[in-house]
């Protein structure tokens, strides 16, 4: 099962795999084989394990060994897990992510908005905290809106393909940044970023502030090598702003990754670690969006 299908652990979700299908192109069938499976955590420790019924594996493909059904109710926090399936010493692996079913994405002290409206401006001027999660298409073309963000990387070379989309090469971040504490990640893209990359624009960081260090960076095409961001933080007016060009609000009841990332960002903003170093003038922020 592809990694973008994320599991809901606290609701007693049963992990269902697609049928496990071996492919064997040798001169003879493999007799009386017992395929085995394991689910491991990020440290390589077994969380669950099992095996399939002994079977003969013929030459060719199309044989279904069976499916894996495992209750995940014992998992209480967001984690990255890996499914391993092995047959006679040969092994394949698939990453997947488990998130709690119920997370709080409301905080009375933080204004969460998709628009830089009067309410958001007043909140910042009064010294408050604002989480601005922009809808796709909100960033102005010249500020990054024209850049085709994609989960998959560039095909071949945009200089040879007339700038065929996508124009980006995934994300780059610090997995230990407190803003990502409840959104397990490597320093690079994995399947849990597919949703974000599919609902976002890039922010051209130099149009905001030269030298600003984003919480999550987007890697640009090597031909243009622009400094791009997906999540940034700054001081605006008297307040603190966490700005993401990912739409984390629209239909997020159907998007567990969006809901979990939103929760992680809110949790970060609630703590003392949220203290942006960059001061952003109002005119820069206002000119960023349509």
Regions found by a protein language model. Give the residues of each.
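Short, compositionally biased P/S/T/A/G/V-rich stretches that sit at domain boundaries
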Residues: 1-13
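Beta-strand-rich binding/interaction modules
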Residues: 15-53, 65-68, 78-86
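Catalytic beta-strand/loop cores that center a nucleophilic Ser/Cys/Thr
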Residues: 139-142, 157-256, 273-290
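Short alpha-beta junction capping motif
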Residues: 108-157, 235-239, 244, 265
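Short amphipathic C-terminal alpha-helix that caps PH/PH-like domains
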Residues: 257-269
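Low-complexity, Pro/Ser/Thr- and charge-rich linker/hinge segments at domain boundaries
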Residues: 94-115
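Short, exposed coil/turn segments at beta-strand boundaries within extracellular/luminal domains
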Residues: 88-93
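Beta-strand-rich interaction surfaces with strong enrichment in secreted/lumenal proteins
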Residues: 8, 52-57, 71-72
